[in-house]
């Protein structure tokens, strides 16, 4: 798992450049779960990917600024016919999941009036709602807004429970636009719902006035609570203090703190309306001031200090919990910012008796099991305050659940130490093996890195947990060991770094590298969301689905070869049951030589060949499928960039074969691009084809080659405030900037560019090429490149929105496009009827014809060679909802389409083979509507 492990406000150094307001590299090693580990320089590498080379820093407030700019860019119709300008190749977009794997979740709440209704907030995935106890989820955020959610609160008063609030902005962020390492994820204020979470509007007086600077109290909303006695809305804003609204959020007044003071703040309210607040001593500039714990008995009009004498003088983040059954009992969990000599964090825990005004320091009783720090987190490790959660059982003020990486419980409020010989009396989630030797290292059906714990309001044994993989439920919090259920079905907030499509037309397989959720394998069945399978652990990186083997990798370049388990190559060897064959060259054993998300390339014309960069040199393996591929690596010392450069991206051609493009980046000098002919055999002949005038210090993030013309390529530079998109049509002899309207307008910057794809299509009877660019504000495309006058239009706005499109890949054999987003899972786009891939694709779905297509009032589904006939047919819309269904006990079915809205639908049918086995197929159907 990737994490920035130190507090935000320490000063970091990037090759001698002092960068205020950024993380410094951690003194901790990364957790060593199944090879998890982060190279010490990983934070600097990823920071360099997005920083503005002119300032050496990521621009302040860049998330809000780029979203504001992207909101004014043109959009393509999502799933509709209608071209904006010229021969645009429209795609039918939909989310494919994974349906069963979530992502980082900061906020979770249960509806007090209907406990089957839950609202969840993902760090980069928006607000989601479930009305069936977490069995299924629906996105309720506008897809075009900032999807970073940090807190959710309901008005608990009778007659007001339909009113909800959520806040945005992570000051200790894991934001996808810089992969969470360096810069703060500026929020866009507080949002309110008056229809029980169905729709949301921003509260105008909380919107930051300047999206490019820290000028507003609501840039970083940490916690919202609503008084059950008065309805006043209280907000703990990081870097400022505690605010109150007495008019439902229309106006807010500062009660405690000041702008740029108290970097971390929290607030809690009891059932009787008593307020507790805690403010850090740490300030925004890294210095310290007076912080502590405060109490108000008059709805925030006045506050008294109740800081215990044993509370640390200097402290970073603290969180509060008040016992629901005894409002005079409260607890405070604190990360001080200090590290002990043994490498463990200094975490404090206090019990407060609000009735007597006394407090007890119970820090020494927190879990501290023997074992390595990072195998499972045997103590309360918060990752530098990134992961902290705490709650009190509703019927027992002494039953406390708290966690950092791992989740723990105590039945006496940690008045006594946990029983060392009875691990599962205390350990209830996250990791399960304190020795670090158990390969099943995660607690069953649970996940590490805790962000929220919520008890059922009327069933005190039932508890919900939100963490880095989504949402989990236990029905009996007292059971030993605890039994969890994963409730992330359809909660599509996975954070992908990488996406891959196998080359064959109609292949339904997809592969993605996901942060904290490994390499995920999916099969798209054409309707609804696909189930995902984690075939490799850690932070998933690059991968490939080949003819004979599958390949996956985790952070720092640790690539693996995996067997297929069936003749159809639809089942892949799992890391949980098999020892995977390592394939990376010897340098991969040293994470200091590898990038955090490290690229490799398998030659599309010969899957025996893998290209693997190491710093400024290249390795090649020509017998990747040998019994021991590690014996067949060659270091190509003459295929090298100058000292100080590192190869950051590479891609191999499809036609003509064996042309390799490599991109190299430098901290201060302009990036370099190289081309190598006969890359499968050559050890010489590297040709520099760099972009003239490229910005010094710019980071080459991606290279895309035309699949049928290796002389046409696109270079993607990912830094902010530079020209970052170039094209060549002559093999790199000349480059033309094509960023066009993605560049920004002088007042607002354009988005960071992440990846590109070139997709040749035949559309409406004449050739066209679709160019796609993934950005930090969504996916864009054009069929008309015109240098810096190019007009890029946003794809899939109504489904993908402005999610971070980390990687886009295209398949010319059938025109399919896949996009791995950082926070909204995986999307696929397929050509609408009339648009087919450049390579020939049969217009039948396995012996069945669907006609006419497009259709208006009706369509027929006809079996070409019926054996036992059709069984049933369903029609789904682009978001996977069942629209209509038909029984079809024969070889032909008439589908009544009357009254349907125009658009693209998925027609899915089940049929019975001669053996009696029922199988399923699917095909797109364009309905023209009335």
What spans do the regions from the language model cover?
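Beta-propeller blade termini and top-face loops
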Residues: 24-833
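Alpha-helical and His/Cys-centered functional microenvironments
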Residues: 7, 11-14, 92, 226, ...
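Compositionally biased non-globular segments, especially hydrophobic aliphatic-rich helices
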Residues: 7, 15-16, 236-239, 707, ...
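Generic detector of low-complexity/intrinsically disordered segments
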Residues: 7-12, 16, 244, 356, ...
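Low-complexity, Pro/Thr/Ser/Gly/Ala-rich linker/spacer regions in secreted
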Residues: 831-845
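Bacterial Sec-dependent N-terminal signal peptides
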Residues: 1-30, 838-839
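A general lysine-centric signal
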Residues: 2, 129, 351, 923-924
């Amino acid at each position: 798992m990737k994490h920035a492990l130190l507090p935000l406000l320490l000063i970091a150094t990037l090759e001698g450049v002092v960068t205020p307001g950024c993380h410094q590299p951690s003194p901790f090693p990364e957790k060593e779960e199944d090879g998890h580990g982060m190279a010490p320089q990983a934070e600097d590498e990823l920071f360099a990917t997005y920083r503005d080379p002119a300032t050496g820093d990521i621009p302040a407030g860049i998330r809000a600024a780029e979203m504001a700019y992207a909101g004014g860019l043109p959009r393509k119709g999502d799933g509709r016919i209608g071209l904006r300008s010229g021969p645009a190749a429209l795609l039918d977009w939909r989310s494919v999941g994974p349906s069963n794997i979530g992502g980082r979740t900061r906020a979770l709440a249960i509806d007090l009036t209907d406990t089957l209704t839950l609202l969840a907030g993902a760090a980069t995935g928006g607000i989601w709602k479930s009305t069936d106890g977490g069995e299924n989820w629906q996105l309720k955020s506008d897809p075009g807004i900032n999807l970073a959610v940090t807190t959710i609160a309901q008005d608990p008063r009778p007659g007001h429970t339909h009113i909800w609030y959520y806040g945005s902005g992570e000051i200790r962020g894991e934001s996808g636009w810089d992969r969470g390492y360096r810069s703060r994820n500026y929020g866009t204020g507080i949002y309110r719902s008056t229809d029980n979470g169905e729709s949301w509007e921003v509260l105008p007086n909380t919107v930051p006035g300047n999206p490019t600077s820290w000028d507003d109290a609501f840039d970083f909303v940490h916690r919202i609570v609503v008084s059950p006695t008065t309805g006043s809305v209280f907000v703990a804003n990081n870097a400022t203090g505690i605010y109150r609204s007495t008019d439902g959020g229309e106006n807010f007044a500062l009660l405690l703190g000041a702008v740029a003071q108290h970097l971390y703040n929290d607030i809690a309210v009891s059932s009787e309306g008593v307020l507790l607040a805690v403010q850090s001593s740490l300030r925004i500039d890294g210095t310290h001031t007076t912080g502590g714990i405060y109490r108000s008995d008059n709805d925030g009009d006045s506050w008294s200090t109740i800081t215990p004498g044993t509370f640390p003088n200097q402290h970073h983040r603290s969180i509060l919990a008040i016992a629901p059954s005894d409002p005079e009992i409260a607890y405070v969990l604190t990360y001080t910012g200090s590290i002990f000599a043994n490498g463990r964090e200094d975490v404090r825990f206090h019990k407060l008796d609000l009735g007597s005004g006394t407090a007890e320091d119970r820090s020494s009783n927190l879990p501290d099991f023997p074992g390595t720090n990072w195998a499972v987190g045997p103590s309360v490790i918060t990752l530098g305050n990134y992961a902290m959660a705490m709650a009190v059982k509703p019927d027992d003020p002494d039953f406390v659940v708290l966690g950092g990486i791992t989740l723990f419980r105590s039945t006496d409020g940690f008045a006594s130490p946990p029983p060392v010989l009875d691990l599962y009396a205390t350990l209830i989630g996250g990791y399960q093996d304190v020795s670090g030797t158990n390969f099943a290292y995660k607690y069953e059906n649970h996940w590490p890195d805790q962000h929220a714990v919520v008890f059922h309001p009327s069933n005190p044994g039932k508890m919900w947990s939100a963490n880095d993989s989504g949402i989990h439920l236990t029905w009996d919090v007292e059971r030993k060991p605890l039994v969890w259920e994963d409730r992330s079905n359809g909660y599509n907030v996975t954070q992908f770094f990488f996406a891959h499509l196998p080359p064959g037309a109609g292949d339904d397989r997809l592969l993605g590298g996901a942060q904290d959720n490994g390499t995920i394998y999916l099969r798209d069945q054409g309707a609804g969301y696909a189930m995902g399978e984690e075939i490799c652990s850690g932070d998933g990186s690059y991968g490939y689905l080949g003819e004979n083997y599958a390949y996956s990798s985790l952070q720092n370049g640790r690539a693996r070869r995996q067997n297929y388990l069936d003749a159809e190559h639809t089942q892949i060897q799992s890391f949980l049951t098999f020892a995977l064959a390592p394939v990376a060259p010897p340098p991969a054993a040293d994470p200091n030589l590898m990038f955090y998300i490290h690229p490799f390339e398998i030659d599309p014309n010969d899957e025996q060949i893998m290209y693997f960069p190491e710093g400024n040199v290249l390795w090649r393996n020509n017998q990747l499928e040998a019994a021991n591929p590690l014996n067949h690596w060659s270091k190509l010392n003459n295929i090298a960039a100058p000292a100080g450069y590192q190869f950051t991206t590479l891609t191999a051609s499809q036609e003509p074969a064996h042309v390799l493009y490599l991109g190299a980046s430098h901290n201060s000098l302009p990036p370099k691009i190289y081309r190598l002919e006969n890359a499968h055999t050559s050890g010489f002949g590297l040709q520099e084809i760099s972009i003239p005038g490229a910005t010094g210090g710019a980071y080459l993030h991606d290279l895309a080659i035309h699949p049928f013309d290796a002389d046409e390529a696109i270079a993607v530079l990912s830094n902010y405030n530079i020209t970052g998109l170039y094209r060549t049509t002559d093999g790199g002899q000349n480059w033309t900037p094509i960023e066009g309207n993605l560049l920004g307008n002088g007042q607002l910057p354009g988005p960071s560019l992440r990846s590109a794809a070139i997709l040749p299509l035949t559309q409406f009877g004449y050739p066209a090429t679709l160019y796609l660019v993934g950005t930090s504000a969504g996916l864009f495309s054009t069929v008309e490149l015109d240098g810096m006058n190019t007009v890029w239009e946003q794809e899939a706005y109504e489904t993908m929105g402005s999610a971070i499109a980390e990687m886009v890949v295209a398949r010319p054999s059938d025109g399919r496009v896949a996009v791995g987003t950082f926070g909204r899972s995986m999307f696929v786009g397929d050509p609408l009827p009339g648009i087919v891939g450049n390579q020939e694709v049969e217009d039948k779905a396995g012996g069945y014809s669907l006609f006419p297509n497009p259709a208006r009032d009706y369509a027929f589904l006809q079996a070409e060679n019926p054996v036992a006939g059709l069984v049933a047919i369903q029609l789904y819309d682009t978001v996977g909802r069942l629209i209509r269904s038909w029984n079809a006990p024969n070889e032909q079915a008439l589908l009544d389409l009357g009254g349907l809205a125009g658009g693209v639908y998925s027609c899915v049918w089940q049929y019975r083979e001669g053996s009696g086995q029922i199988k399923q197929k699917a095909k797109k159907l364009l309905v023209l509507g009335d």
